[in-house]
Regions:
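Non-catalytic, mostly N-terminal accessory regions of nucleic-acid modification and defense proteins
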Residues: 26, 32, 40, 45-264, ...
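Arg/Gly-rich low-complexity intrinsically disordered repeat tracts
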Residues: 9-12, 17-19, 30-34, 38-41
Length: 553
């Protein structure tokens, strides 16, 4: 026997370690509740630790290690959604899973806070009224922890309750909240546009039963759930053109983070955050630093990551993705960040780091374009202006953008390249291969720059994984390892070279990828991109003619 200190989420227990207690054998498992702290033996080959109403883990006495539990649950949920008439796409699957997951998570969060308050002799005020809490309407339990199907609604009764009572009630929190960064506001925002698409109350009952099997309490559980959820987002991203708006391949994000190297205490933003992949991966990167203090961990939770997202579904996915990665109340705002005039951005809004992959080929209305000094309908170009503006002096950025930005000859492209080179040190350009973004149909580059000093030299790296990328053969971390290594010293190689600022044409500011080792890279643009540039040039010509006619009157 030996003395041991065992930690559950936000709780601890000092006790004596039983002789049978195996080492490193945690395996996420079903809930077990008890009123008294202590060890508890169960029949057969398993042992369980019970800690005052706190979910721990099944312990496998054989010491074989923990095994994934939730993968099959996610498959079961998708199987039910597949036969549901109201859900026809991968986007529907993720959307419907997300709002139910959020309510399950919210219930666990509130239960944890209530337990903490009780242990401190305080009373916790629940956010949700009792009849709208998960453990009342969705998963009422009997004493053994199983769902009480005598109390749990199903069929038309369940569907009508969700559609006519639950969702309107949750939507109402947006008006009651004290501010946009509160959990109450986020509840209202999520349910202001997200609707229940599950038409069969029996299917809804089955999905709820599966969702209730999932737990968010331990780091192992959150880790597994975050990976499963990311897999769903990836499938959605592979589903077609629209799905690609939500997913940036994670190996590319991780490589970008390794180049920019965000630090504890810095503010990180993504104002086109999609599923919050950049913010989640940045959190993982920074959280895994050794020796973080409690204060630093609190800073990571509350004062580090900020995002904005225009689309309702992406907003919900971003919130849920950050929660599963371990950020309890994400600082994500549901808004079109381009609607803010750049002149209105205050110093206290500026940040140290920007990561982003703004939408390809989007078109913004004239009134939105008025918010920017370089006016263009190209959404990505407006975002790039915003990213430069919101950075502090010395701030760093990693931005994904279409490779045609480097060479387009329209006025907006030329002016924006000039602005970037003069106001920032564009030190690195990563040229990504075709297929990096499935379904997007365009080639991309990643721009790495630091605000405050003009560009002196640009280092290029031409990424070539040596194979055709596709859905079953995507970009991986190993493909990017050489880029990350060489970028530290901006070394020349058959795939990398440097361009002095003095060699950049001062009239076009052309930054095209031209590898001196392999000749100039010919960029074959899609017909759609060519037509878009023709339309842009035509619009510029029409504007000039309009002004000339005005002068002749």
């Amino acid at each position: 026997m030996q003395e041991v200190f065992l930690v559950a989420p936000r709780h601890g227990l000092t006790g004596v370690k039983p002789e049978w207690w195996p080492q490193n054998s945690y395996r996420p498992g079903p809930a077990y509740w008890a009123t008294t702290p202590g060890y508890h033996s169960t029949p057969a080959h398993t042992r369980m630790l019970v800690l005052r109403k706190i979910l721990l883990r099944w312990i496998d006495a054989s010491g074989l290690g923990w095994k994934p539990m939730f993968e099959q649950t996610f498959k079961n949920i998708d199987d039910v959604l597949w036969k549901e008439a109201g859900c026809t796409t991968e986007l529907d699957y993720v959307e419907q899973t997300s709002w139910l997951l959020f309510l399950k998570y919210l219930d666990g969060l509130e239960q944890d806070k209530a337990d903490e308050a009780t242990m401190e002799g305080k009373k916790y005020e629940f956010i949700l009224q009792k009849q709208y809490r998960w453990d009342v309407w969705a998963a009422p339990k009997v004493k053994d922890g199983k769902i009480d199907h005598n109390k749990a609604q199903t069929g038309d009764d369940l569907r009508d309750f969700v559609n006519n009572k639950l969702i309107p009630y949750l939507h109402g929190f947006k008006q009651k909240a004290s501010g946009p960064n509160t959990l109450e506001y986020k509840i209202g925002e999520i349910f202001s546009e997200i609707k229940n698409k599950i038409q069969s109350g029996y299917n809804l009952r089955e999905i709820i039963d599966h969702i209730d099997e999932l737990e968010f309490r331990s780091q192992n559980q959150k880790h597994e759930l975050s990976h499963l959820y990311e897999a769903k987002i990836k499938n959605m991203g592979n589903a077609g053109r629209n799905g690609g708006e939500y997913y940036t391949c994670r190996p590319l994000i991780r490589a970008m983070i390794q180049v920019v190297q965000p630090k504890i205490g810095e503010r990180i933003r993504d104002d086109a955050c999609g599923s919050a992949g950049f913010l989640c991966e940045s959190f993982d990167y920074m959280r895994n630093k050794k020796g973080l203090t409690t204060k630093e961990l609190k800073t990571l939770q509350e004062k580090t990551f900020y995002g904005q997202e225009k689309k309702s579904l992406a907003y919900v996915i971003a919130i849920m993705n950050m929660i599963l990665h371990g950020i309890e109340v994400p600082n994500i705002v549901h808004a079109n960040s381009l609607s803010e005039n750049l002149a209105d951005i205050q110093d206290n809004e500026r940040c140290d780091v920007v990561f982003a992959n703004p939408p390809f080929g989007g078109k913004e209305r004239k009134e939105v374009q008025q918010n920017f000094p370089i006016r263009t309908g190209e959404t990505a170009y407006l975002f790039l202006q915003r990213f430069i503006k919101v950075l502090k002096a010395g701030g760093r950025a990693g931005i994904v953008i279409k490779n045609t930005f480097l060479s387009n000859t329209d006025n907006a492209s030329v002016s924006l390249r000039k602005h970037l080179l003069e106001s920032c040190n564009l030190h690195t350009v990563l040229d990504c291969p075709s297929g990096t973004f499935l379904g997007a149909g365009v080639k991309t580059v990643v721009l790495f720059f630091e605000k405050g000093t003009p560009t002196r030299k640009v280092w290029y790296y031409q990424l070539d994984p040596g194979r055709n990328l596709g859905k079953t053969n995507p970009l991986n971390d190993e493909d990017l390892a050489e880029f990350v290594k060489l970028q530290k010293t901006v070394a020349d190689s058959p795939k990398s070279w440097s361009l002095d600022a003095k060699d950049i044409d001062p009239t076009t500011f052309d930054l095209s990828v031209k590898n001196p080792s392999g000749g100039e890279v010919v960029v074959h643009r899609s017909p759609q991109e060519i037509m878009e540039e023709i339309a842009t040039l035509d619009a510029e010509s029409a504007e000039v003619l309009k002004r000339i006619k005005g002068l002749l009157k």
